[in-house]
């Protein structure tokens, strides 16, 4: 019998962040590096620390997480997966409350033209709208 599909809210409660030492090169990160594996909750919390109206690349965001956690790098694969979870969860929460107050501002890191944005279950132009609104209000 197939398992019930997890909701975005359930996916937000993934394993806690942890670190690994790479046994071999991975995604451009050399063997022996200390790699931070984040979590959706940590990513959501970190997104909230990016100032209103600011935009940051995913690469810069990963470097920031790595530095904060005293690691050489943050896993690019899990970061992308977790960012998508945060974005989808945020979208659901926005639709249930019609307010972005208190939500994780993933649009400060996710570009509307990015491959990740194309996978989201909503129109990526909403990302541009949020960026424009923040620009006007900052």
PLM regions and their residue ranges:
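Nucleic acid-binding interface residues in structured DNA/RNA-binding domains
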Residues: 3-6, 11, 15-138
């Amino acid at each position: 019998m197939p398992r019930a599909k997890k909701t975005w809210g359930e996916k937000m409660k993934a394993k806690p962040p942890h670190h690994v030492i790479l046994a071999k090169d991975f995604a451009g990160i050399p063997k022996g590096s200390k790699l931070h594996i984040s979590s959706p909750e940590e990513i959501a919390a970190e997104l909230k620390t990016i100032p209103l109206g600011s935009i940051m690349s995913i690469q810069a965001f990963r470097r920031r997480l790595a530095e904060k956690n005293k690691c050489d790098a943050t896993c690019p694969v899990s970061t992308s997966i977790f960012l998508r979870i945060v974005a989808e969860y945020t979208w659901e929460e926005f639709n249930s409350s019609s307010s972005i107050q208190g939500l994780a501002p993933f649009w400060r890191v996710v570009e509307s033209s990015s491959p990740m944005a194309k996978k989201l279950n909503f129109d990526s132009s909403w990302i541009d709208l949020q960026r424009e609104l923040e620009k006007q209000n900052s």
